Design a protein with these regions (language model features):
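Alpha-helical structural context detector biased toward long hydrophobic helices
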Residues: 1-239
């Protein structure tokens, strides 16, 4: 596909039908790949939602789930915008590189997701992987940015790369998965209290771009005020 696209651009011809075909082919290819990762992880997600953490003792299931999480991280507007915003445009070469990255994002994002997923898998003995069980009256919420870094070092005033990461992924209103650099949770299963649920829901909302999702209006109402807070603060920061 990239070879065909290169030939088309080298020809100097501009044809809307050809460009539409190339774009559709790219989208279909990537959607099929993403669908395959989602299908592979579905069995794991169902088991984890039922608190069956032991399913991840199977190496294949662990690989599939880690790749799924990696792709969930990169398939967001927040991640894309953050990467592109970090690219310099101080000279012609940097502009060319930045434009190339933006143009190839459909492919690069997939490779970034695979790398993140492999990193999760290969470092699984060093990080702490935990299942969080929420039996409080406050359900977990999720958002258009489904995997968030809830480590305390994450700044709410600037979009800088944090030194550490506690990657948190809500699976259902009652169950979430977390991969910790910190020692906040040891590996295994943990029942958590309302204070932690409120903290994580607030961070999910703050790192959402537009939408938060819950199992009821009452579940999301207290957190609407936090939506996009991290990005709004950065928009108001002088450059």
């Amino acid at each position: 596909m990239q070879h065909l696209e290169a030939i088309y651009h080298a020809s100097g011809i501009q044809d809307q039908e050809t460009e539409a075909f190339l774009n559709a082919s790219q989208c279909n290819l990537m959607e099929n790949l993403h669908s395959s990762h989602e299908d592979a992880a579905l069995k794991v997600l169902i088991a984890l939602a039922d608190e069956q953490l032991e399913i991840l003792q199977d190496k294949q299931h662990m690989v599939e789930f880690m790749i799924f999480l990696g792709q969930q991280i990169v398939r967001t507007k927040a991640y894309r915008d953050g990467v592109l915003k970090g690219l310099h445009r101080r000279n012609d070469l940097e502009v060319e590189v930045a434009d190339a990255v933006a143009h190839s994002w459909w492919f690069l994002s997939y490779m970034f997701g695979m790398n993140i997923g492999f990193s999760f898998f290969s470092s699984r003995q060093d990080s702490r992987h935990a299942l969080l069980v929420n039996d409080t009256d406050i359900p977990f919420i999720t958002s258009d940015h489904p995997v968030v870094n809830v480590h305390p070092c994450v700044s709410e005033t600037e979009l800088s790369v944090p030194e550490y990461a506690d990657f948190y992924y809500p699976i259902s209103p009652r169950v979430a998965y977390i991969i910790c650099d910190s020692e906040r949770f040891t590996s295994g299963k943990h029942n958590i209290n309302e204070a932690i649920v409120n903290e994580f829901n607030s961070k999910v909302a703050a790192q959402a771009m537009v939408h938060i999702v819950g199992n009821s209006d009452s579940a999301i109402r207290p957190f609407k005020k936090h939506i996009g807070k991290r990005y709004k603060k950065n928009d108001n920061t002088p450059s």
